[in-house]
C-alpha cells in the first residue's frame, strides 16, 4: 500500500505510532514492524511529494526513538590508527537497487554474526542514474533497520562525492559547487560519512608529485572545511580522501605521501579542522 495523503498516513499509523506536533512516540513496535513500516517505506519512495516528505520525516523520527540512528564512523576509524583495535574489516556496501529489501537482508546477516561495523553507501553517480536522492536512501536504510529490529548506529556514506573533471576544466568553481550542493543535501539526511573524491583532478604532466596532486589535495581540503562548517553539532563526519582515479594507474606510496602532506598543509592554512579518517588508493 502507498498512502494517498498525509492524513491517511497518520491515521494508519495510529495503532503503532503517536504523533503530537513534531514529537513522535512508538507505542507498539510489533505492530509497526508487522506491515506498517513496509507501507511507510513504500510511501517514502513512491508517494506524492507531500507524502514522501512526511513519510521520510516519520521514518527518521521513529528511528531516533528506537535507536536506529545515522552515525559517524570517524571515532572507530581513528581508534584503529591509535591501535585500539585490529584484525577487523568494515564492509562498505553500495546498495542501490531495491535498497529497502537489500539493506534488510544485510542487517539480518549482521544480527546473526553480531557485526556492528558496516557501511551502506551510494555514490554521486549512482544517485543520478538510480534516481535515489540522499533523503530517500537514508529513509530506506533506517526503515530497514526498524523492520529488522536493528536498533544500533547506522553508518550511511556518500561514496565518491566526485568532482567532474570535464566541468572542472571549464568551470572549476562550478564543479566544486556541485559537490558542495550535494553535501548540503546529504548531511541533513544522515550522510555522516563522506568520501571526497577529487582524484579526478590529478594531472600527471607536472614534474613533481606535489604539483600532480595539487588540485586533488587543495580542493579536498576546501571541501573538508565546508563539511566541517555544515556538519551537525556534536558530530564529526568521517571523511575519506582519494589519490587514484578508478580505472587509471595504480597508486604509489610516494603519491600518498605527496597528497597527505599537501592536504594537511592546505587544511591547516584554512583553520583548525578535523581532517580525514581514511584514504582510498587505486590498486588495479
Each model region followed by its residue ranges:
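Alpha/beta enzyme core
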Residues: 100, 104-117, 135-136, 143, ...
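Alpha/beta catalytic barrel-like cores
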Residues: 1-175, 181-182, 186, 191
Amino acid at each position: 500500500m502507498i498512502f494517498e495523503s498525509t492524513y491517511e498516513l497518520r491515521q494508519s499509523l495510529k495503532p503503532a505510532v503517536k504523533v503530537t506536533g513534531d514529537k513522535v512516540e512508538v507505542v507498539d513496535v510489533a505492530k509497526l514492524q508487522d506491515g506498517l513500516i513496509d507501507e511507510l517505506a513504500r510511501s517514502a519512495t513512491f508517494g506524492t511529494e507531500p507524502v514522501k516528505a512526511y513519510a521520510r520525516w516519520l521514518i527518521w523520527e521513529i528511528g531516533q526513538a528506537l535507536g536506529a540512528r545515522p552515525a559517524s564512523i570517524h571515532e572507530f576509524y581513528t581508534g584503529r590508527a591509535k591501535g585500539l583495535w585490529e584484525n577487523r574489516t568494515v564492509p562498505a556496501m553500495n546498495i542501490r537497487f531495491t535498497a529497502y529489501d537489500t539493506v534488510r537482508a544485510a542487517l539480518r546477516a549482521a544480527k546473526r554474526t553480531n557485526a556492528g561495523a558496516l557501511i551502506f553507501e551510494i555514490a554521486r553517480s549512482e544517485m543520478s542514474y538510480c534516481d535515489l536522492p540522499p533523503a530517500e536512501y537514508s529513509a530506506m536504510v533506517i526503515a530497514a533497520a526498524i523492520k529488522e529490529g536493528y536498533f544500533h548506529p547506522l553508518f550511511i556514506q556518500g561514496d565518491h562525492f566526485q568532482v567532474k573533471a570535464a566541468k572542472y576544466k571549464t568551470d572549476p568553481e562550478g564543479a566544486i559547487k556541485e559537490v558542495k550542493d550535494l553535501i548540503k543535501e546529504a548531511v541533513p539526511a544522515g550522510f555522516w560519512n563522506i568520501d571526497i573524491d577529487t582524484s579526478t583532478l590529478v594531472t600527471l604532466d607536472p614534474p613533481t608529485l606535489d604539483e600532480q596532486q595539487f588540485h586533488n589535495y587543495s580542493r579536498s581540503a576546501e571541501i573538508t572545511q565546508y563539511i566541517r562548517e555544515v556538519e551537525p553539532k556534536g558530530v564529526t563526519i568521517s571523511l575519506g580522501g582519494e589519490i587514484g582515479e578508478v580505472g587509471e594507474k595504480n597508486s604509489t606510496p610516494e603519491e600518498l605521501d605527496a597528497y597527505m602532506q599537501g592536504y594537511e598543509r592546505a587544511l591547516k592554512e584554512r583553520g583548525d579542522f578535523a581532517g580525514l579518517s581514511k584514504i582510498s588508493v587505486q590498486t588495479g
